[in-house]
């Protein structure tokens, strides 16, 4: 059995699970002021929309069982919907994942189950790194899904991780990334200055022949 996952923010890591261990697509919409707030120690819940497709009929009701399990590892207001198509079953999840510093996320995860987070860090050049990271709950979810069906599971990174960075800051913001695609064009290094209300859509390819199959996608943000 083969399956695909598509996650949109605007969505997840996502973010989440199905017959394939890695999601196909994770779309994340990130506002620059949310990053600024997170740097001050607050947690910001980032909305995620994830869709998973299995290329077979779900005769045993595994998707419904997986949904019940996944609810334990997602925000309480997550919305699940399932539909059937010509190629199999599709499960859509609308949820959120937390954005924050390592310290604030550690505290948050002490009382909240989430399979993925957006980690904010400041490097030695004063650039702000934002990366998608799985948590210990991701491994727990993967294990429980495997108990239902050995073809079920969850892991990161996704085949494609799509960061949509939107500037709502008063001043210009610089966003950059390494080895990415923008408007379907490959870039060894991508950089863009965002005016207020400007945006950049950056895609990380995480397929098996890509470096991002082994490391977590990260974008760099600089507030001049």
Could you say what each language-model-derived stretch is?
Residues 50-75:
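N-terminal, post-signal-peptide region of Sec/Tat-exported proteins
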Residues 17-20:
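C-terminal motif of bacterial Sec signal peptides marking the signal peptidase cleavage site
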Residues 73-224:
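Mature, soluble, non-transmembrane domains
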């Amino acid at each position: 059995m083969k399956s695909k996952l598509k996650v949109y923010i605007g969505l997840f890591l996502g973010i989440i699970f199905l017959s394939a261990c890695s999601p196909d697509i994770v779309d994340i919409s990130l506002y620059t002021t949310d990053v600024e707030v997170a740097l001050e120690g607050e947690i910001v819940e980032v909305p995620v929309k994830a869709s998973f497709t299995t290329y077979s009929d779900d005769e045993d009701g595994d998707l419904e069982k997986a949904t019940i399990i996944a609810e334990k590892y997602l925000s309480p207001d997550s919305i699940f919907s399932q539909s059937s198509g010509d190629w199999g079953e599709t499960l859509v999840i609308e949820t959120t994942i937390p954005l924050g510093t390592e310290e604030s996320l550690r505290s948050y995860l002490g009382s909240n189950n989430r399979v993925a987070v957006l980690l904010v860090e400041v490097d030695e050049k004063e650039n702000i790194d934002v990366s998608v990271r799985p948590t210990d709950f991701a491994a727990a979810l993967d294990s429980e899904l495997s108990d239902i069906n050995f073809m079920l599971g969850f892991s990161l990174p996704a085949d494609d991780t799509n960061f949509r960075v939107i500037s709502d800051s008063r001043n210009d913001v610089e966003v950059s990334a390494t080895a990415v695609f923008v408007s379907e064009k490959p870039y060894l290094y991508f950089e863009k200055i965002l005016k207020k209300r400007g945006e950049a859509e950056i895609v990380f390819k995480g397929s098996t022949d890509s470096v991002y199959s082994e490391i977590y996608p990260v974008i760099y943000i600089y507030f001049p």
